[in-house]
Amino acid sequence: MPKIKKVVATVWYDKENMRALRQVFPEAEFCYVDFYDKDKLEQEVKDADVCILMGDVDPCILGENTLKWIHCDHAGLNGSARPEVFARGIPVTGAAGRSAPVLAEHCIYFMLQNCYHTKELLAAQAAHHWGVDGSNQWRGLYGRTVGIVGMGNNGRMLAERLHALGMNIVAYDKFPIKGFDYIEK
């Protein structure tokens, strides 16, 4: 692998994660640039080997520079998959699946809110009523059926968690779904 001398990053990491990122490139000069400061970003990448972006590839980094790798710190590279990016011949990578655990939990959070009528419960609590009509009919997620469209990183992570909650899962994906014998396809 060629020696990496300079890394430019625009990611908004906390101190601990920024320190961990710097340790990936221990010998390199490390330069943080605000993603929205396009002039400084364009200037700093001129002699950089690696650029780690919080967003998509911006035209300001496609000028004259020494970049050998661009990493977009998010899933989905549609905004960076453009002819002018490919023309440079610089590998562009993304972070598919990075947020899958949090997104799965986010889905479950809303599913539970819906099952347990959180809005009604909070309104009753604010009115100092400690019972809600019909609450004896409410039931949780266990035994219910859920549909998941797309079994990429997020869909797989969600399926694993919903299976642990005892849900029946029906899933659809454009590719064969492998390794999930509990899913109805």
What are these regions (language model features)?
Residues Y13, D56-V57, G76, A96-S99, ...:
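Short, flexible active-site-adjacent loop segments at beta-strand->alpha-helix junctions, enriched
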